[in-house]
């Protein structure tokens, strides 16, 4: 099977010139930020303008590059075409799930024909939508951010995402917004009188009904484009980062299954923080705990190789020092392109 395995590098991503969106995510504490910064650094060598975006509330890319970033794209020191920015996108809390949104949309459609009941159902739908759906403000901000990125004409965008649960909800935003906006615009006669009242909920401010409809239509066009690109493997891919431990492997499998369900391409896995212990002249590992840890990692590496034989599995070592600053990130990023370097720390 070893002969059939794909190369353990990110060369396939660097060579795919059609890619526009690259997401990097996984369980917390596995080194996602270092990997996303390194991937962005490598992309800056082979692509035009590259943008790195942190959607993680912790915003670690500033610490990684030793440079403060804001919600405005800023040139990364030491690079000529790599920019970075941090946005707040935290869809947390309990509320209406996608299944509930589907039911609300269906109810609104069924009552479209009745004048009084239709208006009441429309109002009820918007009230539930405003009060019960967590992250709608973040979803709108995400949509506006995508429009901004498009206007700035970046060749490729790398997302340093938050831990898995947050990221999966974030990736649902385009589909959710497209369904809701499409339904509301199809029922303008029913919702029209209430759009001003609920305009603030959509982050669109005040204005006349016609202005509100125009803004919503424009946003819907951007959301449809974004949704189509996210589900196009020529435009979008997701890089999963994990470590060789049970919980991380379990969450990686859950993430891959959910990405497949959402129609988002993923064919790269980065296994980070691997031990390559020192040995004596006879080849015996000199550190007993290091040997035990390596044995555990080897077990899960074998499972990863078996489960994901159709993935590019990049295996990165645990280093003796932190990877911080542009030069160190660039140096570390070479390990993602040249696997042969990873047996030497």
Curated annotation (Swiss-Prot):
Compartments, as annotated in UniProt: Cytoplasm; Endoplasmic reticulum
EC number: 3.6.-.-
Any GO BP annotation: positive regulation of insulin secretion
Leader peptide range in chain numbering: none
UniProt xrefs under Gene3D superfamilies: P-loop containing nucleotide triphosphate hydrolases
Annotated ATP binding sites: 27-34, 245, 272
InterPro entries named among the record's database cross-references: Anion-transp_ATPase-like_dom (IPR025723), ATPase_ArsA/GET3 (IPR016300), ATPase_ArsA/GET3_euk (IPR027542), P-loop_NTPase (IPR027417)
Primary site of residence: cytoplasm
One Gene Ontology term of the molecular function aspect: ATP hydrolysis activity
Keywords, ordered alphabetically: ATP-binding, Cytoplasm, Endoplasmic reticulum, Hydrolase, Metal-binding, Nucleotide-binding, Transport, Zinc
Active site: 56
Residue sites binding Zn(2+) per the record: 287, 290
Annotated GO CC locations: axon; GET complex; neuronal cell body
Functional description taken from the UniProt entry: ATPase required for the post-translational delivery of tail-anchored (TA) proteins to the endoplasmic reticulum. Recognizes and selectively binds the transmembrane domain of TA proteins in the cytosol. This complex then targets to the endoplasmic reticulum by membrane-bound receptors, where the tail-anchored protein is released for insertion. This process is regulated by ATP binding and hydrolysis. ATP binding drives the homodimer towards the closed dimer state, facilitating recognition of newly synthesized TA membrane proteins. ATP hydrolysis is required for insertion.
Subunit structure: Homodimer.
UniProt similarity note: Belongs to the arsA ATPase family.
Name the record gives this protein: ATPase asna-1
Source species of the chain: Caenorhabditis briggsae
Gene name per UniProt: asna-1
């Amino acid at each position: 099977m070893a002969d059939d395995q794909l190369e353990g590098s990110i060369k396939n991503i660097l060579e795919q010139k059609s890619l526009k969106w690259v997401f990097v995510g996984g369980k917390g504490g596995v080194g996602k930020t270092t990997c996303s910064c390194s991937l962005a650094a490598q992309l800056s060598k082979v692509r035009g303008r590259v943008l790195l975006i942190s959607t993680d509330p912790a915003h670690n890319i500033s610490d990684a590059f030793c440079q403060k970033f804001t919600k405005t794209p800023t040139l990364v020191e030491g690079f000529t075409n790599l920019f970075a920015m941090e946005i707040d996108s935290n869809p947390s809390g309990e509320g209406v799930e996608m299944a509930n949104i589907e039911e609300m949309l269906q109810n609104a459609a069924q009552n479209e024909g009745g004048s009084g009941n239709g208006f009441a159902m429309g109002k009820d739908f918007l009230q539930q939508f405003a009060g019960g759906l967590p992250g709608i403000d973040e979803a709108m901000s995400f949509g506006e951010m995508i429009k901004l990125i498009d206007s700035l004409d970046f060749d490729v965008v790398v997302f340093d995402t938050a831990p898995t649960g947050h990221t999966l909800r974030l990736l649902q935003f385009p589909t959710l917004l497209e369904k809701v906006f499409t339904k509301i615009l199809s029922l303008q006669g029913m919702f029209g009188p209430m759009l001003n009242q609920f305009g603030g909920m959509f982050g669109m401010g005040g204005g006349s009904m016609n202005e509100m409809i125009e803004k919503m239509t424009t946003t819907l066009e951007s959301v449809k484009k974004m949704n189509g690109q996210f589900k196009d493997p020529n435009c979008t891919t997701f890089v999963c980062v994990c470590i060789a431990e049970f919980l991380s492997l379990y969450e990686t499998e859950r993430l891959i299954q959910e990405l497949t369900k959402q129609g988002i391409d993923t064919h790269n896995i980065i296994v980070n923080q691997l031990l390559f212990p020192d040995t004596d002249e006879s080849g015996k590992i000199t550190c007993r705990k290091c040997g035990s840890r390596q044995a555990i990692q080897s077990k899960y590496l074998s499972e990863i190789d078996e489960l994901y034989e159709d993935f590019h599995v990049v295996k990165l070592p645990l280093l003796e020092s932190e990877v911080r600053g542009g030069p160190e990130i660039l140096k570390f990023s070479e390990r993602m392109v040249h696997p042969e370097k990873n047996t030497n720390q």
